[in-house]
Amino acid sequence: MITLDWEKANGLITTVVQDATTKQVLMVAYMNQESLAKTMATGETWFWSRSRKTLWHKGATSGNIQMVKTIAVDCDADTLLVTVDPAGPACHTGHISCFYRHYPEGKDLT
């Protein structure tokens, strides 16, 4: 059994959400033990809002829920990679992914 490192980030685990089909990274959020348990129980993503200090069910208001396909754990057991089948855009701006901007703007780093 894998033991997750909840202590490193004060009870939170960084969670990368990826589209199971396209492999596009959709968003990064945080889970606590309760949100991970709800995710496992419902098959839909739940996160911990650091700003509101509350659980949130992705898509509860927008309808853009994320159905979980797999959950992988990184080598340090402090980050999760959750692959999902999204019902719509992941970003609150309406973009498919929260990673729709590039830095620096309009420039390649190569």
From Swiss-Prot:
The lineage of its organism: Bacteria, Bacillati, Bacillota, Bacilli, Lactobacillales. Keywords: Amino-acid biosynthesis, Cytoplasm, Histidine biosynthesis, Hydrolase, Magnesium, Metal-binding, Zinc. Signal peptide: none annotated. It comes from the Bacteria. InterPro entries: PRA-CH (IPR026660), PRib_AMP_CycHydrolase_dom (IPR002496), PRib_AMP_CycHydrolase_sf (IPR038019). It holds the Pfam family PRA-CH. This is Phosphoribosyl-AMP cyclohydrolase. Binds 1 Mg(2+) ion per subunit.
